[in-house]
C-alpha cells in the first residue's frame, strides 16, 4: 500500500475486523477460525524453513492465502477471476509472497509432511479454510482433504 494514509486505514480496518471476530468467538471454535485463512499452508512454509528469517510470518501467510485460493479454485469453490484479482492486488501494493516457488509442484509437494503437523487436523485429514469470493470463506472444517488427495492436487495448484 503505497500511501501512508492508505496504509494506516488498512491497518485500522484490519484490526477492527480482527476485533469483531475475536470478541464474538473467544475460544476460537467457530467464527474466529476465519482469521486462520492461509495459515495452514503458512505454518507448513514456516516449519519447512525452520522459522528462519528467509520468510516472514506475513509473507508465509500471503503465500498460504494464494495457495488456499488456488485450492479453492480446484475444488470449484472459487472462481479463477478471484485468484487473479487478489494476485493483482498483491502485485499493485508490493505485497511479497514466494512467487517463484508457488508455481513449482515439487516445492508444493515438499510442504505435505509439514501440513500433516497442523494442530487443526483430524482423522488423518488436513482442514482448510477456502475462499468463495473476496470477504467470504468456507465454514471452518468444511474442507477436510486427505494427504493423498492433496498430493494429487499439487501439480494442478502449481499451474494457476
Stretch-by-stretch model annotation:
Residues 1-109:
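Active-site segments that bind and position negatively charged phosphate/pyrophosphate groups
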Residues 77-160:
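C-terminal charged capping/lid subdomain of soluble metabolic enzymes
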Amino acid at each position: 500500500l503505497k500511501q501512508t494514509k492508505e496504509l494506516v486505514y488498512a491497518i485500522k480496518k484490519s484490526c477492527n475486523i480482527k476485533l469483531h471476530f475475536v470478541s464474538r468467538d473467544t475460544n476460537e471454535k467457530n467464527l474466529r477460525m476465519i482469521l486462520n485463512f492461509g495459515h495452514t499452508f503458512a505454518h507448513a512454509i514456516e516449519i519447512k524453513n525452520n522459522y528462519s528469517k528467509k520468510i516472514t510470518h506475513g509473507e508465509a501467510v500471503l503465500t498460504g492465502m494464494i495457495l488456499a485460493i488456488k485450492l479453492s479454485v480446484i475444488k470449484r469453490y472459487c472462481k479463477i477471476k478471484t485468484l487473479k484479482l487478489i494476485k493483482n492486488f498483491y502485485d499493485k501494493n508490493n505485497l511479497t509472497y514466494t512467487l517463484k516457488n508457488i508455481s513449482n509442484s515439487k516445492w508444493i509437494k515438499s510442504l505435505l509432511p509439514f501440513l500433516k503437523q497442523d494442530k487443526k487436523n483430524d482423522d488423518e485429514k488436513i482442514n482448510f479454510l477456502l475462499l468463495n469470493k473476496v470477504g467470504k470463506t468456507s465454514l471452518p472444517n468444511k474442507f477436510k482433504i486427505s494427504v493423498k488427495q492433496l498430493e494429487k492436487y499439487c501439480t494442478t495448484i502449481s499451474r494457476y
